[in-house]
């Protein structure tokens, strides 16, 4: 089972003696294995992108590739240098799913039943969807309009294309839930303009999309490369790695109580996808640090820590807004410890010290939800290893 301590799913060692899923193989050239935070400190000896002079035409050498500021032909996928990116792409393809294959009949009946859910549970569902229906569109915009054009490793671009498609599937899933339940579409889809706790999170994210989407923005200097790196950290560690987890926990908690099981099943698939996106983003971040150690300055790390602290506060306010009273055996204060736990994990994964005193995961069952590589029946839907190699099976 993929656990929080194995969440990177790479062959790289985890910091602070957190073991990865498999033993680390030391690469023979410029990190062919996925990079770890501990391998990307200021003492890295890999050639900096600023002094790199790789050929721009002709046959590509794997050793000449760079994540950013590369000079090799981005249209030539092989030879691979970053095999971890290709492996994640293949794993994501194997986990393909579509929302309409999930049965929503029980959810519809429960939602229509006046006594099916409490008012607090209904508020939670609507606030939850209010954030997610547009969040994945923001993530997709960040990829297709921003970060994709600044990444110069074609195997990483290949994953980004798959990731953008999955963001579209997630938006489709939330729309499918909204439509199935007969919710007011304009209320839910415009929540990011009308609900302050949702709006605050989105306004935190938007500047990091806009800078990369600016057609005049180009990497190649310390300042612009740090701007790109900061945006990648915000989206991998804070959006996909933190801002989604209150919502995931809430809907999956409903599913654990045999409520809204169709929605919970889709959220479980989305959680699995987003865990892969987060891990890929962290690998890219660490590889950029390895290839460009001059970016990882003390001042820059202080800026990243400040962003982490702000994100924890924003997500905690969202938790308070979605559940002002205790519901489902959860309450907002429980999420304070959870968010600090996640923030510490993300910080360590990119080579920062923990931001908070030792925090434990108050929801260990969430670790089980990340992995679907086995027969499992969490929500009475009898899902059997949903992969394209074996179609979704309903008993």
Question: Which residue stretches match the model-derived regions?
Answer:
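N-terminal intrinsically disordered, low-complexity tails
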Residues: 1, 5-44
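Membrane-interacting alpha-helical segments
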Residues: 37-57, 121-123
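Amphipathic alpha-helical packing elements
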Residues: 50-111
């Amino acid at each position: 089972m993929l656990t929080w301590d194995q969440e990177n799913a790479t062959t790289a060692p985890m910091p602070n003696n957190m073991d990865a899923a498999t033993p680390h193989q030391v690469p023979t050239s410029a990190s062919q294995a996925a990079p770890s935070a501990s391998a990307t400190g200021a003492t890295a000896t890999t050639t900096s992108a600023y002094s790199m002079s790789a050929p721009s035409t002709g046959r590509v050498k794997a050793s000449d590739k760079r994540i950013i500021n590369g000079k090799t032909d981005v249209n030539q996928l092989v030879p691979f240098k970053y095999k971890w990116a290709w492996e994640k792409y293949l794993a994501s393809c194997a986990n393909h799913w579509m929302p309409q294959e999930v049965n929503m009949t029980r959810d519809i009946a429960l939602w229509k039943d006046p006594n099916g859910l409490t008012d607090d549970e209904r508020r939670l569902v609507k606030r939850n969807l209010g954030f997610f229906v547009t969040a994945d569109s923001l993530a997709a915009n960040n990829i297709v309009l921003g970060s994709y054009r600044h990444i110069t490793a074609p195997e990483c671009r290949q994953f980004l294309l798959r990731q953008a498609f999955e963001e579209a599937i997630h938006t489709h899933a939330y729309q499918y839930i909204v439509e199935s339940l007969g919710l007011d579409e304009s209320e839910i889809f415009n929540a990011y303009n009308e609900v302050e706790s949702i709006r605050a999170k989105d306004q935190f994210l938007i500047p990091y999309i806009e800078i990369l989407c600016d057609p005049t923005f180009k990497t190649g200097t310390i300042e612009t490369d740090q701007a790109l790196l900061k945006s990648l950290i915000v989206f991998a560690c804070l959006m996909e790695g933190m801002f989604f987890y209150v919502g995931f926990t809430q809907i999956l908690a409903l599913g654990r109580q045999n409520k809204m099981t169709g929605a919970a099943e889709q959220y479980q698939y989305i959680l699995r996808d987003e865990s892969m996106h987060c891990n890929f983003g962290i690998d890219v971040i660490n590889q950029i640090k390895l290839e460009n150690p001059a970016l990882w300055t003390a001042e820059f790390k202080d800026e990243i820590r400040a962003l982490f602290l702000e994100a924890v506060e924003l997500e905690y306010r969202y938790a308070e807004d979605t559940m002002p009273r205790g519901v489902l055996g959860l309450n907002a204060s429980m999420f304070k410890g959870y968010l600090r736990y996640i923030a510490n994990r993300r910080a360590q994964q990119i080579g920062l010290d923990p931001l908070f005193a030792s925090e434990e995961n108050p929801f260990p069952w969430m670790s089980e939800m990340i992995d679907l590589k086995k027969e499992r029946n969490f929500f009475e839907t009898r899902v059997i290893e949903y992969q394209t190699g074996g179609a979704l099976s309903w008993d």
